Amino acid sequence: MIARIWSGESPLWRLLLPLSWLYGLVSGAIRLSYKLGFKRAWRAPVPVVVVGNLTAGGNGKTPVVIWLVEKLQQRGVRVGVVSRGYGGKAAAYPLLLTPETTTAEAGDEPVLIYQRTGAPVAVAPERAAAVKAILAAHNVQIIITDDGLQHYRLARDIEIVVIDGVRRFGNGWWLPAGPMRERASRLKTVDAAIVNGGVARVGEIPMQLAPGLAVNLRTGARCDVAQLSNIVAMAGIGHPPRFFATLEACGAHPQKCVPLADHQTLAPADVQALVGEGQTLVMTEKDAVKCRAFAEDNWWFLPVDARLSGEQPDKLLEHITSLVR
């Protein structure tokens, strides 16, 4: 229903316009208060790169964060990552991740980024506190904030927006009548716009999510996902249909697709109930970090990597690297 409202297919979005105007007024006032100096943002002693969205819902932001961290690490840059930690609840904040940190404490995306990159990761509702925690414990040269484009209390040096190339901005309205956190005109002020799928427009960086080999949660064994049989697909991400379409494109044809809410807590019994005798469960890597502790032998995940094309990605990386002292 939400997807139909935000796309403009359902006329119900008109009923939500008063709330959208209120949302737009408040969010615009917050941004303007920082722009005019009525409120002061905290500036870290190292450069800060924000990777965020203009819309609610999954746009492929986390793969971009992982891509950026890995590319900077390859250039010898010491990177730290901060996040709000959606879906997690720590005993105290800021929380600096360790190998023992669970998704229940930190949220699924921070744990995934930590496991994939090995970079220091900290979570806190106040992102400045997370930055300070990393700087106190690690000699990092740059901070990447996973989401937080609208978190103006943290000053930033680079802003990167990730756009779903198929859905783009839906009906163009602010939440809740539409998907927008800010108006599309905000793109004029960011340093880079990365478009996940669809067709990138002039000045935008095209990106595709490239699937790898399926990985068994219990053993770590790898295989072509198309070789798995009787698949039940599970996706607890911002836009589950994208994952199901990826499986189809890989030659894997699920018998059943189970969309879940983004950051949804997964209980062992609930996940186990999805799979019948002789079936194979295939999930996203973000779901896998929540399920690994109670995984069954026939549970697999399909990792994806961001693939950015054209000359702009290298120019963006050069620009970011030039900020490092």
UniProtKB/Swiss-Prot annotation:
GO biological process: lipid A biosynthetic process; lipopolysaccharide core region biosynthetic process
InterPro entries: LpxK, P-loop_NTPase
EC numbers, comma separated: 2.7.1.130
Pfam family, one: LpxK
Molecular function per GO: ATP binding; tetraacyldisaccharide 4'-kinase activity
Class of this enzyme: transferase
Catalysed reactions listed for this entry: a lipid A disaccharide + ATP = a lipid IVA + ADP + H(+)
Domain of life: Bacteria
Function in brief: Transfers the gamma-phosphate of ATP to the 4'-position of a tetraacyldisaccharide 1-phosphate intermediate (termed DS-1-P) to form tetraacyldisaccharide 1,4'-bis-phosphate (lipid IVA).
UniProt-listed PANTHER family: TETRAACYLDISACCHARIDE 4'-KINASE (PTHR42724), TETRAACYLDISACCHARIDE 4'-KINASE, MITOCHONDRIAL-RELATED (PTHR42724:SF1)
Name of the protein in its database record: Tetraacyldisaccharide 4'-kinase
Organism annotation: Salmonella choleraesuis (strain SC-B67)
Source species taxonomy: Bacteria, Pseudomonadati, Pseudomonadota, Gammaproteobacteria, Enterobacterales
Name of the gene this protein is made from: lpxK
